[in-house]
Design a protein with these regions (language model features):
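Active-site rim/adjacent substrate-binding subdomains
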Residues: 1-140, 145-179
């Protein structure tokens, strides 16, 4: 499964809600997890693999969560989330963020320190969790993808100017790959 890069129009498409979790969607989720692990990522949204279903997968290991690991202890990894909705943001955290669809590019992004996320699981049941720190950042990043928002839209104007050349190069490479 290939991960699409910046410049591919699918990254700007809002996700289509999933009505029912089918065997095909479960297989898609597993393929997305495999692609995410192969790319050393912590999250992946369906748009990043050329699909538009409201689906994202996240796996932030406890050792990567630092001091927030105990706060997220009740959250089972990996998270396979259909129709995730983020609410109740609290606090703020600024940190370096990258994206598998933006290879070699990272920037400082401010996100909520903790959020509540509600979603439908692979079993069709509804779940809710309060997540913190890096896990909250990953959830917000992936749900942004599902809304057609990419992380560089969340960076300051100055940072965006500094990234302009890299983004243009990535967009050209993506366009060339599509032809």
């Amino acid at each position: 499964m290939d991960i699409v890069t910046y410049g591919n129009p699918v990254l700007k498409k809002p996700a289509v809600p999933v009505k029912e979790v089918t065997p095909e969607l479960r297989a898609l989720a597993q393929a997305m997890l495999d692609a995410m692990y192969a790319a050393d990522g912590v999250g992946l949204a369906a748009e990043q693999v050329g699909r538009t279903e409201s689906l994202c997968v996240i796996d932030v290991p406890p050792d990567a969560q630092g001091k927030d690991a105990p706060l997220n202890a009740g959250v089972k990894m990996p998270m396979v989330m259909f129709n995730p909705v983020v609410s109740a943001p609290e606090g703020s955290q600024r940190g370096s963020e990258g994206c598998l669809s933006f290879p070699g590019i990272s920037a400082q992004v401010t996100r909520a320190r903790s959020v509540t996320v509600d979603w439908m699981g692979e079993d069709g049941r509804h779940y809710s969790a309060r997540v913190h720190g890096l896990l909250a950042r990953a959830v917000q990043h992936e749900t942004d993808h599902l809304a057609g928002v990419v992380f560089v839209e969340r960076v300051s104007g100055t940072q965006l100017l500094l990234l302009k050349g890299k983004l243009a190069k990535l967009r050209r490479a993506s366009a060339a790959a599509a032809t």
